[in-house]
């Protein structure tokens, strides 16, 4: 099918600029939003401020907006659920949730990451929202490019299956650049795949 290109924005002004340029949907990137507000990436920007910025972005245009929530702002699945509810209140129609720890970048266990995604899905369902949960896995992002191989692909697919069962709608695989591995992933993944170029 035809890929959907998401324009990353960081404030209301960049959202309007992207809309004027022909974007059909918008996304935020955690790094750019944090930097624009004087913070470093990795959930250092307070969640309340992120939601204020998100609400200004969603009000700036009529386009759907998905928000980068990093790992969900909190140690427990219940914290993730609260973050999802707040993002829905701020006008988001979806989010990215990553499977690594914000402080260290280390990957969470598959079971822990899936539990956080399941909590996110329950929160969206409770809100009655048609909310797209894009499960980000950092399997390739954390590995040097010269180590990208079938082993990492298999790990990514195992996570994709677990995340799909937990209620995720999409799979985001930053760091994956090999056309051959992208083709293999999209052919086998139970979820639609998002890559970053």
Enumerate the language-model features and the residues they cover.
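Alpha/beta enzyme core
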Residues: 1-195
């Amino acid at each position: 099918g035809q890929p959907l290109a998401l324009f990353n924005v960081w404030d209301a002004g960049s959202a309007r600029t992207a809309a004027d340029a022909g974007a059909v949907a918008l996304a935020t990137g955690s790094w750019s939003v944090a930097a624009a507000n004087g913070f470093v990436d990795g959930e250092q920007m307070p969640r309340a401020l992120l939601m204020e910025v998100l609400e200004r972005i969603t009000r700036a245009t009529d386009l759907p907006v998905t928000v980068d929530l990093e790992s969900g702002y909190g140690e427990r699945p219940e914290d993730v659920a609260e973050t999802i509810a707040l993002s829905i209140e701020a006008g988001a129609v979806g989010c990215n949730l990553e499977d690594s720890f914000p402080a260290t970048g280390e990957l969470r266990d598959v079971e822990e990451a899936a539990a956080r995604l399941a909590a996110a899905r329950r929160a969206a369902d409770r809100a009655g929202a048609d909310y797209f949960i894009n499960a980000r896995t950092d399997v390739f992002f954390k590995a040097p490019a010269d180590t990208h191989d079938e082993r990492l692909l298999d790990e990514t697919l195992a996570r994709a299956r677990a995340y799909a069962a937990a209620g995720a709608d999409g799979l985001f695989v930053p760091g994956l650049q090999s056309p051959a591995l992208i083709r293999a992933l999209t052919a086998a993944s139970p979820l639609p795949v998002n890559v970053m170029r």
